[in-house]
A protein has these predicted regions:
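Aliphatic-rich helix starts adjacent to a transmembrane/signal segment
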Residues: 1-38
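Low-complexity, Gly/Pro-rich coil/beta segments used as flexible assembly/activation regions
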Residues: 28-144
Length: 144
């Protein structure tokens, strides 16, 4: 009887330990995904600042609305931004820097003075697909 209680106790501790470890890993991955999402939103706004509103809007309009960019890295050169392909990420090819995350910037152009941006960062934990999402509306302002 005592052996059974000890075995059950050890089994319970092992299960609890693996549950805690899995939750810690999932929390760390979620924090990293949120960081990628925030960086991506800031990058998109920086690209808008580097170009005039009209030039930035025209790049997006030329790619089509709604549009989506898959970003394994955040391009720093304007030419790289302008030449981004309007496409969703491929699970097998488009992970961020060897990390298990896919990053997409979705945008719509509801009118010539507005861009709605949605950043999705996705990853898989076992068989479960997880996602972080952030959304922002960018408005044209007077450029003087």
């Amino acid at each position: 009887m005592a052996i059974t209680i000890v075995v059950l106790g050890i089994s319970s501790l092992t299960t609890l330990n693996s549950f805690v470890v899995r939750n810690q890993r999932r929390s760390a991955e979620r924090a990293e995904a949120i960081k990628f999402s925030q960086e991506s939103m800031e990058w998109f706004k920086i690209m808008r600042q580097r170009l005039s509103w009209d030039a930035f809007y025209q790049v997006l309009l030329a790619d089509g609305s709604p549009g989506v960019y898959c970003l394994t890295v955040l391009p720093q050169e304007m030419g790289e931004f302008i030449n981004l392909a309007n496409r969703a990420c491929d699970q097998d090819e488009d992970e961020i820097l060897g990390r298990p995350f896919l990053r997409e910037i979705h945008y719509t152009l509801p009118d010539p003075d507005t861009i709605v941006v949605r950043v999705l960062v996705r990853w898989t934990d076992g068989t479960q697909e997880l996602t972080t999402e952030s959304t922002s509306t960018i408005k044209k302002w007077n450029e003087q």
